[in-house]
Amino acid sequence: MSSEQIISLIGFPGSGKSTVGVLLAKRLGANFVDTDILIQNQEKATLAEIIDQHDHVYLRRLEEQVLLDMPIHPSVISTGGSVVYSPKVMARLAEASIVVFLSARLDTVEYRISLAPDRGIASSKEQTLADIYRERVPLYERWARVTVAVDDTAPEALVDQLIIKLDALSR
């Protein structure tokens, strides 16, 4: 495991991609890129505001465009939760990086999202969180080379687990 690798974190909003990503990048001495922050800086709005002002499809297109346009250098990349809807982006990430799925139970996601009302979830108004969860989890599982369950585990311990799994891949 080295700072020369590219690691892409995927998972539902609230799964800890940003938190774990920062810690993992620090531990590896790698750069950290959060595509949600790139989008918010570009749009000068929170993800929730972007969805309110436009719609969920617009946010998904932004996520896709940011990841297709972004040069991929050795780093830890935290992706937006709906990035798995873009086969083009996921194929690019799978080819250029180790895709890691931070897997969280639905109750964990619901709780964490309730703590962050500014978090935007790219979905239609008719979809419940459970609907989106059931739709996305198989997509996350399909693209992941590594999966780590995040429920009831401290971020530092998740990073320890991740490093062990990533080291095993490079052997």
Regions found by a protein language model. Give the residues of each.
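NTP-dependent small-molecule kinase module
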Residues: 1-3, 19, 23, 27, ...
